[in-house]
Amino acid sequence: MNGLDFDGSLFWRADFSKPPHNSYTSYDYIKKAAEQKGYKLKQETNPLLFQTSDAKPANESYNVRVDYGTKNVTNLVEYNYDKKAESYTRSSDGVITTDRETGKPVAMQNIFIVEASHHIIDQDGRRDIDLESGGKGLLFQHGNVIETDWKQVNGRIVPVKDGKWLPFVPGKTWINIVPDLDAASISKGEGV
């Protein structure tokens, strides 16, 4: 659903965030709009793969910094691995990402960074990002980093190694899309 088409009816603006990142909707509104557009509401999909056994955490854990900045704007995103919690925390320009309702840091078990072709399409800097063709990726789990490829399968971006899907660690996954993997710099972490 395109927020430009449905702004004010399907989407509403909240005052606790700055535009344009303050547009929200609900399941009921999306369902209503999908019915109006004649979209299928049910579809068979294969489940994502998840690890079923306890994977061993790395002896040395790795953190990653992703530079989304431009020559005029700084935007550094960092993920730091916490060995005790077995999860990553995220910060943006030094500010820890927290859950708006609980105030607690958002903790993720998988960080997936994918390289996808970006093309600027207008003078405002909007981008057309190729999420169909696949490419190279980096998958962070248990403090480890795995060089992967990625594929788009039925609208989902999945990690692939040697032609096979790689399983995610059960929990939360954060996918970062960058024009070049050089935007990601990996460092050995202390592991809290």
Where are these regions (language model features)?
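A surface/extracellular/periplasmic glyco- and lipid-processing/surface-interacting theme
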Residues: M1-V192
